[in-house]
Amino acid sequence: PICDDIINENISGVILFSKNVLTSVMEKKYTPKNIISPNQLKKLIKQIKKLSPNKLFIAIDEEGGQISRLPSSLGFNATTLSHKQLGEKNDTKLTYKEAKKIAETLNDLGINVNFAPCIDLAINKESPIIYKKERSFSDKPQIVAKHAQAYIQAHNKYKILTVAKHF
């Protein structure tokens, strides 16, 4: 279906997921996984790009830490420290280095949009989505801002668009 939409509906982008997405609750149908291995994903992205006469946005949600669609268990080299770990070390050069590793991997695969960094503040210690998954650099806005800036700069070097979230 996505191929038809790219060709016939002139959509301008896709987002890649490593998990099956429920498409029909009633029938319990799921999409097939679209991230299996580095070679498979690179080939898939090339095929998708050939379908459109326009430059497509090929997006992923690759923050690092627990939020990784490109895990080392599938052969990818993008796995990095979590935002929380980076914020605790409070070394923006390290954050840049870790984000650069992600950006290099995305660039190599042909991905040009990353739904990251997460710029939420770690103020709710009970949050199962942000705090418990270590997705925030800190509970202090200044720390979050300077690490987010380093993260974004690393992606800019590879012309990977970033989407700061969930504020």
Question: Can you annotate each of these PLM segments?
Answer:
Residues 9-10, 15-144, 166:
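Enzymes and membrane/adaptor proteins characterized by extended Gly/Ser/Thr/Asp/Glu-rich
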Residues 109, 156-161, 165:
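Extended, charged catalytic domains and RNA/DNA-binding interfaces, predominantly
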Residues 146, 154:
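Histidine/acidic residue-rich metal-binding segments in metalloenzymes
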